[in-house]
């Protein structure tokens, strides 16, 4: 038996394949197959349909009833069901509706997928008969137009090498398509269309309404939140204004209190300054200006005055008279006054503090007792006061007349300043001493 070997000239076959198919890239993977006594190049990649098939499918797509026929072709050729994304571009150019409902596409895909499992005798039928039958058939309603989106994926899988097989179609499949159309028409209830599609549209409209309501609710919630935030901002502004007003009122109160305090302090300082000026005027030969020095001078001046008064008190006879007045039993006819008692107590205290001086000391050394004319005048006044006190107490001593007293007072400064003999002053001062002794003798 002779074996026939095919000619391995790939140029002719490649030329034929390039005429049937589009231009193939150089790096494409190709498989060698034996068909009808010839070697055929078959690519392992997904095949693109030829231009003729696309034009034929575009013509059939304009008639919605051809979807069932194209689906029947896919039943006969299940190997070419895979399709690239680029093959569906021509089918997208004729969308039936502006908005494709996903519920209808899912329903149609499930519904027509059950047609693939139908089986039966096949009878060839020409394309002219199918076209006439499609012209007589009623066009599907608009709600089923989404089924067309399912058809291109199956129709686009036909290869260019099997174009001659598309001229014949089984009659049984066309009859089944008629039955399916009748079922769809009867289930739709006349010209009202498919109730499921209408329900889907109603559900879509209901979902759109609910979405609108949700949007309105969200917008209302946003407006409420914005209004609440505005209210919160206004409340915070009011609080800040209230805090500022309270701070201002507190600051004004503090400033007023400070002003009042300053005024009172100024008045007090003015009073102190006035009193210090008066005290400075009382102190002789005071040239100090500060308060501390003025007060020191005033204290020293008061101490000196106190010492002078003590010396004058001890040198005069007022101490003995006060001591005698302290005992009320000496003078039963005279009531003791509180002023006299106070003087007697002071004299006793002073006598206890200071030792009793000899009365001859002023006679021998008159300069120790009276060192200046002012002290001499004070001593003369003390003598006059002692005489008045003695008269008040009831004992009236014999005193020289007032003219003689003035003479003695005038002579004492002259004698002391002139450093004369002490006889004159002793004779002049002996008279008051004798009167005092006589007075004490009478009392005893």
UniProtKB/Swiss-Prot annotation:
Changing residue 32 to A: Loss of binding to PHYB. GO terms for cellular component: nucleus. Residues 155-171, 224-244, 424-437 have a biased composition (Polar residues). The keyword Zinc-finger does not apply. Keywords: DNA-binding, Nucleus, Phosphoprotein, Phytochrome signaling pathway, Transcription, Transcription regulation. GO terms for biological process: ethylene biosynthetic process; red, far-red light phototransduction; regulation of auxin biosynthetic process; regulation of auxin mediated signaling pathway; response to brassinosteroid; response to cold; response to low fluence blue light stimulus by blue low-fluence system. Mainly expressed in leaves and seedlings, and, to a lower extent, in stems, fruits, flowers and roots. The modification Phosphoserine is found at residue 437. GO terms for molecular function: DNA binding; DNA-binding transcription factor activity; promoter-specific chromatin binding; protein dimerization activity. Residues 154-265, 416-444 are annotated as: Disordered. It holds the Pfam family HLH. Residues 175-185, 256-265 have a biased composition (Basic and acidic residues). Transmembrane segments: none annotated. Disulfide bonds: none annotated. CDD domains: bHLH_AtPIF_like. Induction: Down-regulated by brassinolids (BL), but up-regulated by cold. Follows a free-running robust circadian rhythm, with higher levels during the light phase. Rapidly induced by light in etiolated plants. Up-regulated by white light. Rapid degradation after red light exposure (at protein level). Accumulates to high levels in the dark, is selectively degraded in response to red light and remains at high levels under shade-mimicking conditions. Transcription factor acting negatively in the phytochrome B signaling pathway to promote the shade-avoidance response. Regulates PHYB abundance at the post-transcriptional level, possibly via the ubiquitin-proteasome pathway. Promotes ethylene activity in the dark. May regulate the expression of a subset of genes by binding to the G-box motif. Might be involved in the integration of light-signals to control both circadian and photomorphogenic processes. Homodimer. Interacts specifically with the Pfr form of phytochrome B and with TOC1/APRR1. May form a heterodimer with PIF3. Interacts with PHYB, CRY1 and CRY2 in the nucleus in response to low blue light (LBL). Interacts with TOPP4. Associates to PTAC12/HMR/PAP5 which acts as a transcriptional coactivator. This is Transcription factor PIF5. It comes from Arabidopsis thaliana.
């Amino acid at each position: 038996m002779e074996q026939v070997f095919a000619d391995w000239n790939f140029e002719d076959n490649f030329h034929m394949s390039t005429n049937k198919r589009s231009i193939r890239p150089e790096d494409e993977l190709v498989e060698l197959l034996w068909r009808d006594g010839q070697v055929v190049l078959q690519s392992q990649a997904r095949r693109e349909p030829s231009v003729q098939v696309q034009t034929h499918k575009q013509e059939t797509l304009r008639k919605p009833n051809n979807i069932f026929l194209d689906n029947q072709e896919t039943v006969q050729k299940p190997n070419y069901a895979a399709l690239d994304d680029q093959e569906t571009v021509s089918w997208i150019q004729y969308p039936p509706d502006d908005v494709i409902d996903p519920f209808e596409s899912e329903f149609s895909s499930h519904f027509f997928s059950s047609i693939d499992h139908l089986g039966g005798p096949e009878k060839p039928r020409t394309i002219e008969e199918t076209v006439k039958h499609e012209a007589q058939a009623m066009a599907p309603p608009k709600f089923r137009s989404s089924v067309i989106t399912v058809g291109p994926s199956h129709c686009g899988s036909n290869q260019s090498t099997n174009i001659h097989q598309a001229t014949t179609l089984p009659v049984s499949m066309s009859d089944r398509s008629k039955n399916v159309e009748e079922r769809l028409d009867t289930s739709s209830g006349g010209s009202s269309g498919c109730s499921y599609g209408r329900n889907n549209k109603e559900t879509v409209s209901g979902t759109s309404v609910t979405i609108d309501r949700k949007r309105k609710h969200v917008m209302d919630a946003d407006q409420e939140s914005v209004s609440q935030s505005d209210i919160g901002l206004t409340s915070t502004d009011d609080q800040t204004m209230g805090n500022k007003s309270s701070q201002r009122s507190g600051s004004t109160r503090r400033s007023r209190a400070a002003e009042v305090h300053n005024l009172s302090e100024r008045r007090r300082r003015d009073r102190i300054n006035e009193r210090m000026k008066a005290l400075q005027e009382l102190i002789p030969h005071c040239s100090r200006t500060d308060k501390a020095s003025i007060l020191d001078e005033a204290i020293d001046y008061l101490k000196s005055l106190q010492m002078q008064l003590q010396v004058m008190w001890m040198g005069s006879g007022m101490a003995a008279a006060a001591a005698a007045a302290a005992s009320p039993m000496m003078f039963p006819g005279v009531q003791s006054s509180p002023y006299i008692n106070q003087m007697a107590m002071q004299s006793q205290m002073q006598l206890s503090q200071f030792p009793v001086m000899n009365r001859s000391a002023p006679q021998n050394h008159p300069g120790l007792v009276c060192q200046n004319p002012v002290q001499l005048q004070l001593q003369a006044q003390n003598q006059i006061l002692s005489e008045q006190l003695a008269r008040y107490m009831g004992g009236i001593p014999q005193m020289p007349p007032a003219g003689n007293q003035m003479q003695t007072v005038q002579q004492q400064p002259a004698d002391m300043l002139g450093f004369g003999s002490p006889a004159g002053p002793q004779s002049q001062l002996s008279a008051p001493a004798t009167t005092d002794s006589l007075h004490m003798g009478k009392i005893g």
